[in-house]
Regions:
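Alpha-helical transmembrane segments of multi-pass membrane proteins predominantly involved
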Residues: 1-333
Length: 333
């Protein structure tokens, strides 16, 4: 198995390892700044002189175009997808993002890159498909594109999409259960709002509220499971948990903790009995958002299940292909 190159945050090799994620972050900054560029001015203190600083106020025609955020998001997600695909040309370098103490937080390998392609690909298609679908629908008359000029909700929608992609990417890269949970919640909160984004539609608002309530309960139960695993092992690192399961894997505390953690991932893949909000969420959301829920969100839940079941819960399972060997092969891809 090839060696892992350890890289500290913002050290040598950091940008190359997390290039797709940094592209997403740059796109987020662009979505926050560019749609707000306008004819804003500020007064110099103690004077009556006003200076234009191109932020706020009446926006320019191009920056107020409702399709501009869609193009920024589509190009950003598409660039992240292409960068992820290109990383396979010469083989994926196994790079770990570590703290000063050497603790692994993120791991870039073939396993994570494959799921990142799924996430970024699905979100790219959804962002492009939403370009002409954000006109208000439901209650009241449908607005034309011209009526949507200076409507800042357009940028909000795509900011949520990029935030969702960033959270999903963290889930794929995580080597610590708490880091994985942070990525899961970052993506989940974005999807809650995306489902209920059409505030003019009663169906969308109700669907988003149900999705949020069920998801919050599942996340709370999962977080309680994390605390039980930390109490048992003293760490949430996957390798530490796997080693502890080899020694004391039959203790009731970690088994209960694993069960609680799986509740959170079960909600993301709409596994029974955590599927109650799924039908409303799919019907209340727009078609592109429903597509993200059906593909990228499900893939994110599968990553969590693989991390827990193949790495932690059964590190020495026997059979045609043991779980630990499968994990090592995934690390080597």
């Amino acid at each position: 198995m090839s060696t892992v190159e350890n890289v500290e945050p913002f050290g040598d090799g950091f940008i190359a390892a997390l290039c797709p994620e940094l592209i997403i972050f740059a796109g987020l900054l662009a979505l926050i700044i560019i749609p707000n560029i306008g004819k804003g001015t500020f007064r110099i203190p103690g004077t009556q002189t006003r200076v234009m600083w191109l932020f706020g106020g009446e926006r320019f025609k191009i920056t107020s175009n409702p399709k501009l955020p869609a193009w920024i998001a589509t190009i950003t997600l598409g660039a992240a997808f292409v960068q992820t695909v290109l990383s396979f040309q010469d083989g994926v370098d196994r790079t770990a993002i570590v703290t000063e103490s050497g603790t692994q937080l993120l791991l870039v390998n073939g396993f994570s890159r494959v799921f990142e392609m799924i996430f970024f690909g699905a979100l790219t298609l959804a962002a492009f498909a939403s370009m002409n679908r954000l006109e208000v629908k439901g209650i009241g008359p449908k607005l034309s594109t011209d009526d949507l000029y200076n409507n800042r909700r357009q940028a909000d929608f795509y900011i949520l999409m990029l935030t969702c992609g960033l959270g999903m990417s963290v889930v794929a890269l995580a080597q610590d259960l708490f880091v994985l949970f942070i990525g899961l919640e970052l993506a989940s909160f974005s999807t809650y709002v995306l489902v209920a984004f059409y505030k003019e539609s009663k169906v969308g608002t109700e669907a988003g509220m149900k999705y949020f309530i069920v998801g919050s309960v599942a996340s709370g139960v999962g977080l309680y499971g994390l605390s039980m695993l930390y109490l048992w092992a003293g760490s949430l690192q996957f390798d530490v948990l796997a080693a502890q399961f080899v020694i004391n894997g039959t203790d009731p505390l970690p088994l209960i903790g694993i069960g609680f953690v799986l509740v959170g991932f079960g909600f993301k893949v709409s596994a029974a009995p955590f599927h109650f909000a799924a039908p409303d969420a799919y019907s209340g959301a727009s078609s592109p958002v429903a597509g993200v829920l059906a593909t990228a969100s499900k893939a994110m839940g599968i990553v969590g299940l693989l991390r827990m079941l193949l790495i932690v819960a059964a590190p020495e399972s026997s059979g045609f292909l043991s779980y630990s060997n499968l994990y090592k092969q995934n690390q080597h891809i």
